[in-house]
Amino acid sequence: MEPNDSTSTAVEEPDSLEVLVKTLDSQTRTFIVGAQMNVKEFKEHIAASVSIPSEKQRLIYQGRVLQDDKKLQEYNVGGKVIHLVERAPPQTHLPSGASSGTGSASATHGGGSPPGTRGPGASVHDRNANSYVMVGTFNLPSDGSAVDVHINMEQAPIQSEPRVRLVMAQHMIRDIQTLLSRMETLPYLQCRGGPQPQHSQPPPQPPAVTPEPVALSSQTSEPVESEAPPREPMEAEEVEERAPAQNPELTPGPAPAGPTPAPETNAPNHPSPAEYVEVLQELQRLESRLQPFLQRYYEVLGAAATTDYNNNHEGREEDQRLINLVGESLRLLGNTFVALSDLRCNLACTPPRHLHVVRPMSHYTTPMVLQQAAIPIQINVGTTVTMTGNGTRPPPTPNAEAPPPGPGQASSVAPSSTNVESSAEGAPPPGPAPPPATSHPRVIRISHQSVEPVVMMHMNIQDSGTQPGGVPSAPTGPLGPPGHGQTLGQQVPGFPTAPTRVVIARPTPPQARPSHPGGPPVSGTLQGAGLGTNASLAQMVSGLVGQLLMQPVLVAQGTPGMAPPPAPATASASAGTTNTATTAGPAPGGPAQPPPTPQPSMADLQFSQLLGNLLGPAGPGAGGSGVASPTITVAMPGVPAFLQGMTDFLQATQTAPPPPPPPPPPPPAPEQQTMPPPGSPSGGAGSPGGLGLESLSPEFFTSVVQGVLSSLLGSLGARAGSSESIAAFIQRLSGSSNIFEPGADGALGFFGALLSLLCQNFSMVDVVMLLHGHFQPLQRLQPQLRSFFHQHYLGGQEPTPSNIRMATHTLITGLEEYVRESFSLVQVQPGVDIIRTNLEFLQEQFNSIAAHVLHCTDSGFGARLLELCNQGLFECLALNLHCLGGQQMELAAVINGRIRRMSRGVNPSLVSWLTTMMGLRLQVVLEHMPVGPDAILRYVRRVGDPPQPLPEEPMEVQGAERASPEPQRENASPAPGTTAEEAMSRGPPPAPEGGSRDEQDGASAETEPWAAAVPPEWVPIIQQDIQSQRKVKPQPPLSDAYLSGMPAKRRKTMQGEGPQLLLSEAVSRAAKAAGARPLTSPESLSRDLEAPEVQESYRQQLRSDIQKRLQEDPNYSPQRFPNAQRAFADDP
């Protein structure tokens, strides 16, 4: 292409330019080139030196991408530093929907449907070929052959998170630059005196390879209307550019099946502080360019309330465009600062120093939204995942790839925000292909290039009889041998010895498969059993990756089975539903007929899918529901999507069709009070009574779980077979040493210390065991829990009932505000005292839990602890539902409100999705509530009710204590429907331990001699005052400014400890904090320090220090702080 000289000036120009090129490995190279050389020629000139082909180079200067047809001198880069990043070459045309079977990733999600259209001003953001998401599909045989899964999670050099942050910032800077260029070229702004356009234009627009998600508008003419945060389009488009790199037309030689990432070195690639400074300087320049538009922005918004645009349509459009563009620029600018704000440089390190981050990127990663689903599906695209598969299969037709192109597929799926990359369906690797009838194990390698997790895995359980175009044939009978149970048992022992792989044998396959998308459905009955195990296997593998990586994960999902539409051989996004019914299969070798259950409705299937993926199949309605080829749904971290798949998979090997798998039981009772992260289930049935897994010994189950988990944990650096604690695991990955330490940030008080104890003693295997109803981990932790409660809960006192009640009150005194805040915005049943009701209820429940922990020493400790948690959960839900007049929406609002308050700092989209899921699950639980009204009416307290015989003492203890109900309910309330049913089958929960309220009340009244001298209604009030004054929660000293604004009466009643003015107290406190001991006895040291002359000298020194500080503090004003002035500045 010839250079464009239209912008050349008549000014005398130098003959040569010295250009410095900095690459992502922090190396800077200097090139001297001719001044008339254009950018494209310059790229070719430096290609050999930087080892990056010219078509993959992207040169960035001051946040702008250098255009190939411009001359270098137009950008004024002489003597300046240009940043070079590598990207995939732009496509010259769109793929045709199916490429030449090399396993490439160019097929669009809709199997060749055209990409989403873009606005005229839109720009496609090229992305550096790392640190973003690569999605793909892989297929599993259904003939019972094994699947060898290698999960490699080594980080690529670009995955230095500080480097990723800088690259992200540079990308957003480029986006802002594009918006500024558009604003600077608007004629109406120039007429108003706006800045003149610079020699800048949007980056080149390589043709899109995948359709844009429905919810995303990538910098269109109205960018402010985009629903998605800025990183979404960038990351989505990164996939667009990585995918074409794998296109067979651009990749020389036969490529292996699946994407082939560019080779990287293993050396760390941390950026230097100087690079950070350059980015900040560029941001400063952008802010200065934005200032003129901001001024106009202020003017337009200032007059927007009253401006009349009736006769000025053009002016209105111009102002609206300005508002949109400036608003979008501010959003990108703010997100850029957010991405950079966590970068730090530790000056204590030895040179050369580099940047590090103080908060993981997942804190800011925003999921994309699939609006086609029944509820929005969040998809996190913040990392790179490449999935490659190799194996043998019948050779495809020359032009057919995994998703066969055809109108059937396009009609059966909907546009999605993900790019489906077929990695296991491509042509066989080089070499002679075996006969079609031969089936070998497939190897699926999932390469995860970041500690930050991924998320898109499409899985299709492929029929072994696939015909040459990817068309599955219909088997005529069960293909699985009767010995699948033995096969599984033989495979499992290999787990600990081969920690880098997981070997899975599939249970009985389905009787029939859907036919080709273009043809009619295959005649025959779809077997729910086989499809259930298909989905279970998909969930096990795909859920496993995300379950342990603490991010949303895509797992298998299918379309409803009432009239299953044709499905492609490769899974893809579902068109309008998120329904899947995963059920346990029949006995191996037995009749493969589904149980004769009526077909559930569409809504039932939706609930089945939601509950099935989050907490296991939901009730009998899910059984036998035929589903089509699995596609997509979402499993949240902290909920056992993987566990459900494991459960179904293991249950398929039992000798009889088992009931639904056990729901996740709650963690130990105290943890329920601690407000764990959103999404972690805290409620469920304690015993797996009568369930399929009961026949599995804990040792066998542990070996299975350990083998599966060791695959990922080994990839993350854990030793094979090690039982690394959750705290150690997170500390090692985060690089921080103060996570889960008592007293550290986020671990305050008793509950924080308890959570720390649990995380330090539980491994991930223990958590899986607990979630499946095995209480052995709790039983093992009994000594530590008992010691912890004795020291932190009772303060070393004897565990008598009165001491336990007093300790509960002390612990909960500061939590009452949470109860009040939680119910402040909902309508409570008239006459009900919701605060007192919850406090007394929680008091009683926690007393029984604490008494059990402190007193129980037998082998029933763990089982009883889970039972107490379940009892408290259901009664709490039933009680508050009654107090809210039976309004489920009000109860859901209370729970979701607490979740939002607890989730400050968590991605808002994720929180919104979580609250939606909680509401759906809560509805199922309440429909099967095992606790009747009679069981909870005794807890209800009404306004003005005379104190019940004893309510007060437990109330107080309770009062403060039960403030934790909300945290507990939010985390625990969303229990699975199966949990409620199991609890119902066990009968009403047992009465709480301890005597009745009346007995306790009577005892309390008898122990208070003054109670008879006052009116009965005053007794509880006086008792509460006595207890609250006796046990005031300590708080740190308050500042002078805070105290000066506090009412005098409140200030006088403050019980917080102020600064210690006595030398003996100050020295003893400092010595205790430092762990120092006096040379003499503490008593003699205290006597010496209490001498009047020493005390007076200390007071004078303290006064002098404060006076000096006040004189040097520019913010101190005697008029504003008169008390400080009188106390310290004036002469005595």
Swiss-Prot record:
Modified positions (Phosphothreonine) in chain numbering: T117, T350, T1053
Positions of the UniProt region annotated as Sufficient for the delivery of client proteins to the endoplasmic reticulum: 1022-1132
Residue positions where N-acetylmethionine is found in the record: M1
Region (Disordered): 87-126, 189-272, 385-441, 461-528, 560-603, 651-692, 947-1132
Region (Required for interaction with GET4): 1010-1040
Compositionally biased residues, Gly residues: 681-692
UniProt motif (Nuclear localization site) ranges: 1012-1054
Segments of this protein annotated with the region 4 X 29 AA approximate repeats: 242-636
Annotated Sequence repeat ranges: 242-270, 415-443, 574-602, 608-636
Highest taxon in the source lineage: Eukaryota
Subcellular location: Cytoplasm, Cytosol; Nucleus; Secreted, Extracellular exosome
Post-translational note: Ricin can induce a cleavage by the caspase CASP3. The released C-terminal peptide induces apoptosis.
Site feature Cleavage, where: D1001, G1002
Coiled coil: none
Tissue: Expressed by immature dendritic cells (at protein level).
Residues found modified as Phosphoserine: S96, S113, S964, S973, S1081, S1117
GO CC, one annotated term: cytoplasm
Consequence recorded when altering P1078A: No effect on interaction with UBL4A. No effect on interaction with UBL4A
Chain intervals with Pro residues compositional bias: 200-210, 251-262, 393-407, 427-438, 507-520, 588-599, 656-680
GO BP annotation list: apoptotic process; brain development; cell differentiation; chromatin organization; endoplasmic reticulum stress-induced pre-emptive quality control; ERAD pathway; immune response-activating cell surface receptor signaling pathway; internal peptidyl-lysine acetylation
Keywords: Acetylation, Apoptosis, Chaperone, Chromatin regulator, Cytoplasm, Differentiation, Immunity, Nucleus, Phosphoprotein, Repeat, Secreted, Spermatogenesis, Transport, Ubl conjugation
InterPro entries (alphabetical): BAG6, Bag6_BAGS, Ubiquitin-like_dom, Ubiquitin-like_domsf, Ubiquitin_CS
UniProt subunit comment: Component of the BAG6/BAT3 complex, also named BAT3 complex, at least composed of BAG6, UBL4A and GET4/TRC35. Interacts with GET4; the interaction is direct and localizes BAG6 in the cytosol. Interacts with UBL4A; the interaction is direct and required for UBL4A protein stability. Interacts with AIFM1. Interacts with HSPA2. Interacts with CTCFL. Interacts with p300/EP300. Interacts (via ubiquitin-like domain) with RNF126; required for BAG6-dependent ubiquitination of proteins mislocalized to the cytosol.
Function summary: ATP-independent molecular chaperone preventing the aggregation of misfolded and hydrophobic patches-containing proteins. Functions as part of a cytosolic protein quality control complex, the BAG6/BAT3 complex, which maintains these client proteins in a soluble state and participates in their proper delivery to the endoplasmic reticulum or alternatively can promote their sorting to the proteasome where they undergo degradation. The BAG6/BAT3 complex is involved in the post-translational delivery of tail-anchored/type II transmembrane proteins to the endoplasmic reticulum membrane. Involved in DNA damage-induced apoptosis: following DNA damage, accumulates in the nucleus and forms a complex with p300/EP300, enhancing p300/EP300-mediated p53/TP53 acetylation leading to increase p53/TP53 transcriptional activity. When nuclear, may also act as a component of some chromatin regulator complex that regulates histone 3 'Lys-4' dimethylation (H3K4me2).
Note on domains (UniProt): The ubiquitin-like domain mediates interaction with the E3 ubiquitin-protein ligase RNF126 which is responsible for the BAG6-dependent ubiquitination of client proteins. SGTA also binds this domain and competes with RNF126 to antagonize client protein ubiquitination and degradation. The ubiquitin-like domain also mediates the interaction with USP13.
Entry protein name: Large proline-rich protein BAG6
